[in-house]
Amino acid sequence: METATRTTYNGWANRETWNVSLWINNDWVAYEQARGFMVDYKGRTPFQDFVDAYGYISTPDGVLYNDPKLSKRELNSMMRELL
């Protein structure tokens, strides 16, 4: 009998991606900034462009917004779903 390997964290690619999404969606200031940013956004990489525009460095609990483990694909999708 094979054992399934857990490959996600709460439905996200990993803990870091989940954590960043959690903070953007649950911190009122970050959420409002992200929604406002997306209103007129026409680019292809909304997550990175948002982080760069607002100078985000890390979540309050220490996950870096430029952590190489982040799934940019998932975070870009999350940003597009804010509207």
Regions found by a protein language model. Name each.
Residues 1-83:
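Acidic interaction surfaces
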